[in-house]
Amino acid sequence: MKNLRNRSFLTLLDFSRQEVEFLLTLSEDL
């Protein structure tokens, strides 16, 4: 259970980072 929770947490962090980079790229295009 602990490993799965840690994995989900890391995945969420990765996703958030990708979201931020995507938004930054969008703002650069604008």
UniProtKB/Swiss-Prot annotation:
Keyword Zinc annotated: no
UniProt catalytic activity: carbamoyl phosphate + L-ornithine = L-citrulline + phosphate + H(+)
Compartments where located: Cytoplasm
EC number, as in UniProt: 2.1.3.3
Top-level taxonomic group: Bacteria
Alphabetical keyword list: Amino-acid biosynthesis, Arginine biosynthesis, Cytoplasm, Transferase
Gene Ontology cellular component annotations, sorted alphabetically: cytoplasm
GO molecular-function term, one example from the UniProt record: fibronectin binding
One annotated GO biological process: L-arginine biosynthetic process
Pathway(s) annotated for this protein in UniProt: Amino-acid biosynthesis; L-arginine biosynthesis; L-arginine from L-ornithine and carbamoyl phosphate: step 1/3
Primary location group: cytoplasm
Role, per record: Has vitronectin and fibronectin-binding activity.
Family: Belongs to the aspartate/ornithine carbamoyltransferase superfamily. OTCase family.
Protein name, entry field: Ornithine carbamoyltransferase
Biological classification of the source: Bacteria, Bacillati, Bacillota, Bacilli, Bacillales
